[in-house]
From Swiss-Prot:
The lineage of its organism: Bacteria, Pseudomonadati, Pseudomonadota, Gammaproteobacteria, Enterobacterales. Belongs to the class-I aminoacyl-tRNA synthetase family. Its main location: cytoplasm. PANTHER family: ARGININE--TRNA LIGASE, CYTOPLASMIC, ARGINYL-TRNA SYNTHETASE. This is Arginine--tRNA ligase. InterPro entries: aa-tRNA-synth_I_CS (IPR001412), Arg-tRNA-ligase (IPR001278), Arg-tRNA-synth_N (IPR005148), Arg-tRNA-synth_N_sf (IPR036695), ArgRS_core (IPR035684), DALR_anticod-bd (IPR008909), Rossmann-like_a/b/a_fold (IPR014729), tRNAsynth_Ia_anticodon-bd (IPR009080). Signal peptide: none annotated. One of its GO terms (biological process) is arginyl-tRNA aminoacylation. The keyword Nucleotide-binding applies. One of its GO terms (cellular component) is cytoplasm. Transmembrane segments: none annotated.
Length: 576
């Protein structure tokens, strides 16, 4: 049930006989109710191009559109300087409420099925997940759920950093610390070893050479290195899975497609690109010169694939990765959720892949970049000592804060309820706060806003849901099977239109990879229901058909809030 698509299709069909170029024609929601519910956008630029004057629009074209939308719109209105406003018909709204009430998943239509790979989370092995992994993990998972709902085959790809130079450093470090017992090593230990190894790598030339030597040994899959590598990798994977489970993220071991997976395919890329005259040997380095990427001096940029010492760089692994994803999965779209600092790297990789014809032209490669998480002073979100904040510590703190809030609001809550509510509210609040922000911008992390019961927050939406559920339970329907919608008041119509707009919101989010649009919708729906609740009494209504209609609207609201939060990966609560 997509109102925008229904209106657009009808308007285009109405104008089809006129042979106009309608590619720029759009339907958008109006900002103010006095201008109707929707507007036809772009029609005036189309008419101007075809030298059609205002009189012809009013006397010929507008009546044709009106006739085509006769079952949908109450009226169509031209407003100067050049808007065509559409007022939806009440009977049409009532009929479509009935359709989505009886349909599965609120009548959301399945799209033409595509195989889409979502590359997200992708933490480095040997380090604990930190706040920097939060955006990719949470946004990528939500978009995966939404695309699955729309009927796509979604392949989740956790491109973990389980290969490369950092392992050479760790292996060299372990080689020097012969007394280490791997059975006793924790993830925290592992991260400390990496920090020590990195410091030594940056200062000690001999250790640097030793690290590069071990990186080559690992690339050659020498048994002693592979055994240690497996132990390190398994330890990190198990620790990361605990974070995913806490966050209600759908990633598991089956979704891991780390850098090591593509190691066997890299030599082919290294030999193939020079044959295609795309790569050159410059001072022993295999590299690609990209004329459409310029450095600060205006010179073409070079992307090194293999260094003279034999080690591979990330670019060649990512090239092999894209080729693999098409060859093995026949992916039609690959979406990357990484921060904006990766933009140039990914665009260069995409460029090389296209030039090498490793994927067909129809395969879409998209980088859904995101900004940084900041403190109140707009500096990177770190501890006072300047260390990155571990995600496990952040989630623990959020749960503790939620627990205190629950006890303060309702001291009589049982211990079991406090535990389940603090998990749902604490973790849900972190996720929602992240998802409610435009992913392309930086945002300030603020505990007061995250756990607030006011404004566009998880607790506000979760509480709104509990209110709706409570209302439904208190006012039992006498005839559940005789579903009928009778919209008598303006607030009922406003809520109804909001409910019918759910699918177009989901479609917009899926196209743009912007879950904050869904968060804004759920917040608006919660507010719209609150206005409806205050102005459209259910208990005091004597007319049974109107009372039932309002209860059916409440049921639809609860379903929509539930599905919406499920798509964000946020648990519902029925009591707060």
């Amino acid at each position: 049930m997509n109102i925008k698509n229904i209106l657009l299709k009808n308007v285009k069909n109405a104008l089809k006989p006129s042979n106009l170029d309608l590619r720029n024609l759009k339907i958008k929601k109006t900002k103010f109710k006095k201008f109707g519910n929707y507007q036809i956008d772009g029609i005036f630029s189309i008419l101007n191009k075809n030298k059609i004057n205002l009189n012809e629009l009013l006397n010929k074209i507008l009546p044709i559109i009106n006739m085509k939308l006769i079952n949908v719109s109450e009226k169509i209105e031209f407003v100067k300087p050049g808007y065509i406003n559409i007022f939806l018909k009440k009977s049409w709204i009532e009929d479509n409420l009935l359709k989505i009430y009886h349909s599965n998943k609120l009548g959301i239509s399945k799209l033409k099925k595509k195989t889409i790979i979502i590359d997200y989370s992708s933490p480095n092995i040997g380090k604990e997940m930190h706040v920097g992994h939060m955006r990719s993990t949470i946004i990528g998972d939500s978009i995966s759920l939404i695309l699955e709902l729309l009927g796509h085959k979604v392949i989740r790809a956790n491109h973990i950093g389980d290969w490369g130079n950092q392992f050479g450093m760790l292996l060299a470090y372990f080689n020097e610390k012969q007394n280490l017992k791997f059975s006793e090593i924790t993830c925290t230990d592992l991260e400390n070893y990496y920090i020590n190894a990195k410091k030594k790598y940056d200062k000690d030339l001999e250790f640097k050479k030793k690290s590069q030597f071990f990186t080559l040994k690992l690339q050659k899959k020498e048994k002693d290195c592979i055994n240690i590598w497996k132990k390190i990798t398994n330890l990190s994977i198990e620790n990361n899975q605990k974070i995913y489970d806490q966050l209600n993220i759908k990633l598991n071991k089956t979704h891991i497609m780390g850098e090591s997976l593509y190691n066997d395919f890299v030599p082919y890329i290294i030999s193939d690109l020079p044959k295609k005259n795309l790569a050159i040997n410059k001072s022993g380095n295999i590299m690609v010169i990209l004329n459409n990427f310029k450095n600060k001096q205006g010179k073409s940029m070079g992307v090194i694939l293999k260094k003279r010492n034999g080690t591979y760089l990330y670019s060649v692994i990512d090239i092999a990765c894209i080729k693999y994803r098409y060859d093995f999965f026949k992916a039609q779209k690959i979406i990357y959720y990484t921060d904006s600092r990766q933009s140039q790297h990914l665009l260069q990789v995409f460029d090389i892949v296209r030039k090498a014809k490793y994927i067909p032209n129809f395969v879409k490669l998209e980088h859904h970049k995101f900004g940084m998480v900041l403190k109140k002073d707009k500096t990177p979100f770190k501890t006072r000592s300047g260390d990155t904040i571990k995600l496990s510590d952040l989630l623990k703190k959020s749960k503790e804060k939620a627990k205190k809030l629950i006890i303060k609001k309702n001291p009589n809550t049982s211990i079991d309820e406090i535990e389940s509510l603090s998990q749902a509210i604490g973790i849900g609040s972190i996720k929602y706060f992240e998802l409610s922000k435009n992913r392309e911008t930086d945002y300030i992390f603020n505990w007061d806003n995250i756990l607030s019961f006011n404004g566009n927050t998880a607790p506000y939406i979760q509480y709104a849901y509990t209110r709706v559920i409570s209302l439904i339970k208190k006012n039992k329907l006498k005839n559940k099977n005789n579903v009928k919608f009778l919209l008598k008041k303006e607030e009922e119509i406003d809520l109804s239109i909001c409910l019918l707009q759910f699918e177009e919101i989901i479609n917009d989010v899926s196209k743009l990879g912007t879950p904050h649009i869904l968060c804004n919708y759920l917040y608006d729906l919660s507010k719209t229901f609150s206005v409806f609740y205050e102005n459209c009494s259910i208990i005091k209504t004597k007319e049974e058909s109107v009372k039932n209609s309002r209860l059916f609207l409440s049921i639809l609201t609860s379903r929509t809030l539930k599905v919406g939060l499920e798509l964000l990966g946020i648990p519902m609560v029925e009591k707060m």
